[in-house]
């Protein structure tokens, strides 16, 4: 691991933003300014991804993990593990090479990699403040508590002896507050890869010195909608029909099963399709389908383990649509030449329900706090999903007097967690 360029002060503590899509490490000493620690080369963010190579036996992380997989190395690629916390999958094991591993162990392996980065930089690595969404699981307090306990257990098992949690939007508020010179009422909008969280927080330079800030958090709400859901619906609505979704059996009366296509459009479900049984199913469905050429494309994805490459092309298309009115989603490899033009209008139509859920949760935060939209002084946008134009408009249109603060899309939570760690442990 490369050393950082300057010396880390003694008494420096860490915050870890373990995200569905990307993760960061923030560090700060009590009374000092927080900063992000480079976690992959010079990069301040790392994709929350692992690749277990069957070729050399190594475990790769982040961009290197994605690259190994995309280049066709033999092994197992894992991403979006955070979205499994609190679900039934956490009680299952999955085959990695010749071993079966629990998903908690896989999450722990990524957390260990982050802890090793702290140690290599000379940061005290036995204590950490971990970020968490307002809701890991919507409308299920027991499952939500289980998810937090699972994440804490995974961290402790990898050497973080003292684990504390802070809500991710609150962490983003702490960072915003460090830049203020007057009191304000802020709405923190954090659209992450897997969750969207909203907090109404009273911020001021004076209150920043208080140890207990609970009275300043007027409301926190959240919904299990994030950037990967936008990818999934874009894929289901516009891409998967070209791979068989919505097709009929040859009798013209019955639709083909949909679960294969839903899984292929969902990052953390794609690996479950790479089995001999699913491949046999695809061959059977090809023979029985009215449009076998579509199923032939799907079979190619399974046979050549190309599902994540297609999902990556969909995600890249979504990102381009933040600036462009239309884009092409392309997957061109031996045996499959797929290209599809998608407009921003079509993307927004496919994801309208997701935007509606975000708007409803935002309105709930204001109602729970007992404040009007006119009373909000600033809205802080963070998380990669906040870059989507329809989301940005939905989050700001109803706040007529609020200054829109577009913070570091991927770094503000990690910086706030570092501030919180310095306050708690310093």
Protein language model features and the residues they cover:
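Phosphate-binding glycine-rich/basic clefts of nucleotide- and phosphate-handling proteins
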Residues: 45, 202-333
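Short, well-ordered loop/turn and helix-capping segments at boundaries between secondary-structure elements
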Residues: 236-245, 397, 401, 419, ...
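Intrinsically disordered or highly flexible coil/loop and linker segments, enriched in small
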Residues: 90-91, 120, 124, 244-248, ...
